[in-house]
Amino acid sequence: MAISPSRIAAYDCLFAIDSGTAFSADALASVEPGLSEKDRGLCHELVLGSLRRQIYLDRLMAKFAGAKKLDRAVRVALRLGAYQLLFLDRVPAFSAINESVELVRKAKKASATGFVNAILRRITRESIEIAFADEIDRVSVETSHPRWLLERWVNELGQDRAFSLAAANNAEPPLAFRPTARSSGVELEDVGRPSRHVGGCRMGTGISGQLLELERAGEIYFQDEASQLVASAVRASDGESIIDICAAPGSKTGTLPVSSDRLVVAGDVSWPRLVTLRSNLEHQGVVDITLCQYDAEVELPFADSTFDVVIVDAPCSGTGTIRHNPEIRYKLNEADFLRHSSKQLKIALNASKILKKGGRLIYSTCSIERGENEDVIDRLLRLRPELGVTRPTVDDRFVTSEGFARTFPDRDDMDGFFIAQLTRTP
């Protein structure tokens, strides 16, 4: 039996993600150009849907397969088949089962074809009932968030909010994009409506051939509304110098106000990241930005008080972007948060040294963790008393009582971001 291109592509993506050799965004980007628009849509749904339901699917597999240790190829095929049977009504059961079996055969695991066939057929015939240890276990399984991560959010946000956040992380995020320096602006009126909260941002109703053509031509850039909110908070007056410290891949850098009479610098830690940054900026038609390689955690190669605006979009856990990158929840552990917060503080400290008197430091993350956000800023302010919190230039609804800005997937229907604006006293 022939296997559809969409399922082959989805299986390859999920296998690479499960192996730890790719993230979903990169895996999908590598296979989608070779698929038709219809197959591309199904592949996208299969990959992200299976990842969003992975713990639930694995608990179900444990119920039917017992303690049997599953080979990765078999495990991925079972997840893919079970997801279609349980969550995609439009997919015929025989297609989901038969093509999952053939995927296992294609992976040279012919001895497991009977096992895969039997498990998937049991799912179609038998009652789907899973026993839960407690309420947190139920939500952990039903929303496919590791228990330790859910407990962390319960402790920080309260149970109702933590459960709401976990549910929102499994929703398909709205499609947001923005025009680039190459955009004529005319076509955009037909492919999206203006965002209610972020100037220049447009909201689409789904990936279309027209949008993909505009993206390939460099006229639009796909970027979540919250990420664009961070970029919009960077307000620079004429002639003010700007540096984007952790710039790759260039999503926010591409929105910076550039001109031949303004110093704009963007840099990152490695040459491959700079290559990606340069390619991305060129694709967007962005010029007049100086690129620089450095390790911002160790030292920045600039004199003190060089820049009027310093942007630190710090490396982080990414827990605010789980809607777009569902596999993040399975790759994290508690030690990651401590490692990130230590790195973030070192980068922010070095960044503050090159900030001019009266200048502004914009610190942001795509994490919802207080330890990577408010706590980092609190420690920075104790070490740099010349810095003070000033309100970021964003919609009032996002501003917190502490003078920062926060977005959340469940409350705002956008990724979870944090923004702090610090001003150095003259």
What are these regions (language model features)?
Residues M1-P426:
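S-adenosylmethionine
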